[in-house]
Design a protein with these regions (language model features):
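N-terminal catalytic or cofactor-binding beta/alpha core of small enzyme domains
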Residues: 1-76, 85-91
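Aromatic/hydrophobic pocket-lining residues that form π-stacking "cages" and hydrophobic walls in ligand
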Residues: 28, 138, 190
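Single conserved hydrophobic/aromatic residue that forms the stacking wall/gate
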Residues: 189-197
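Active-site-proximal helix/loop segments of hydrolytic enzymes
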Residues: 59-64, 70-74, 78, 84-185
Length: 197
């Protein structure tokens, strides 16, 4: 798993990785390991370089680490890229599941094409259909067990490093309007996993 490490939540303490999407990744790691799924959790920050936020280059910085991890651990079957969405301050992405307030999640897919320009040749991705399939399967499974837990699947024109593995999930866990507890709860108290697919 990798993430935009500086993405934080309402009430997050500045400078603490555990209060950002990295801390949410820690919860997901623990949850998957409880299901006997081996996890390589990349806790590095790719959207800040030399103390300066550089979100536009984060995917380039992360690509090297993804390649390195896939080479080092060739048995990796699923790549999960965690993010936190940015929404209007009045937008609340909260649901209640298992008696807990939790952030809604959104599966995000890069298509390497736009309706205006067609295929983006330099962003070739042989796994577009595979990635869409796992997002759709996860969305259906979540809707079956936890109605209202997921938002719509978001489709965007670029690639988002989804070309390295046929099962890549880019997941937006809540938004800046969610508390850290809501973000962590959504992965702590729900159970569909990529193994279910």
């Amino acid at each position: 798993k990798r993430q935009h490490g500086s993405e934080a939540y309402r009430g997050s303490r500045k400078g603490r990785k555990s209060d950002t999407v990295i801390g949410v990744g820690d919860v997901l790691t623990k949850r998957l390991e409880q299901k006997n799924i081996k996890v390589v959790h990349d806790r590095n920050i790719y959207d800040v370089k030399n103390g300066k936020e550089e979100r536009s280059k984060a995917y380039n910085y992360a690509a090297t680490a993804i390649e390195k991890n896939l080479k080092k651990y060739p048995s990796i079957q699923v790549v999960i890229d965690l993010h936190r969405d940015g929404v209007n301050e009045s937008t609340k992405l909260v649901t209640r599941q298992n008696g807990k307030r939790m952030a809604q999640i959104m599966f995000f897919n890069g298509l390497s094409r736009t309706t205006k320009t067609g295929d983006i040749e330099y962003l070739y991705n042989p796994y577009i259909v595979d990635n869409l399939a796992i997002s759709f399967q996860m969305q259906l499974k979540a809707a079956e067990y936890y109605p209202g837990f997921t938002r719509r699947i978001y489709l965007k024109g670029y690639r988002y490093n989804m070309h390295y593995c046929p099962k890549t999930l880019l997941i937006e866990v809540g938004a800046q309007t969610n508390t850290l507890a809501e973000a962590k709860n959504c992965l702590l108290y729900t159970s569909p996993s990529p193994r279910d697919m």
